Amino acid sequence: MKNIIIFLLCVISTNCFAQYTTIDTVKYQFNYATKFSEVEELHPFDDEIVVEIGKDKAMTYGYWGRANDLAYDSIMSHGGNAADYFALGNPIATYNDYVIKNYPQKGLLSVTTYHGKKFIYSEPIVEKKWQLEEGDTTILGYNCRKASCTFRHRSWNVWYAEDIPIPEGPWKLDGLPGMILKAVDTKNQFSFECIGIKENVNKPMSAKLSKRVKTTPVYIERLEKLHSSNFEAYLKLIGSPYASNPKMSKKTACLLEYYEKKDTKK
């Protein structure tokens, strides 16, 4: 399947890439096998994310989220339709956000997401209070030390490689004296494990940043909670004309981070 995606990326038109804003040049690329839980009641889904390290920025995005987006744009720009896209049979992406650190300026990070509209929000990069732990291991030939912290109501164990002196990691996890190659939350609802490293990549770091509605992380959290617990209310909030199934079971959203401790109907 990845060979098909690589072929499509080679024939993508200039118009598709024109939708992307270049923000840096990629020096290193890290691929991670991931597990994401969308709701408390179901098991995690497998996916893959990419972490790109630039000169002064770092960006995380879903491998299949980006690949599917580019493939869809390419098909449409060449006169195809949705049926042509679905005929590819690509995996459904569970992670579609972009997390961009030191954008739009140093010390801030921006997140793009989609809930009926294309949203973007920015927030300060938070310093994590890491604690060193016993349990060192080896990942892809790198000796990795173990550390732990609690970040926005979720506790994490991570393993970082001091031989890769980059204080970054997947998603919003960062701040250690080495690249985080593995991260698992203590509830086993989310995990990231590095499966590939590329050096001297030298390609544009880019993302779709134009024509997005500015919002706040708290508002996005409320949308994600409603999506699982009250889908009808969620559709009304995002202004969707589609009706929900009244028999749809209500579930509890499982989020990577929690800004609010209690659910809200707003």
For each feature predicted by the language model, list its residue ranges.
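Extended soluble regions of mature proteins
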Residues: 20-266
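Bacterial Sec-dependent N-terminal signal peptides
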Residues: 1-25
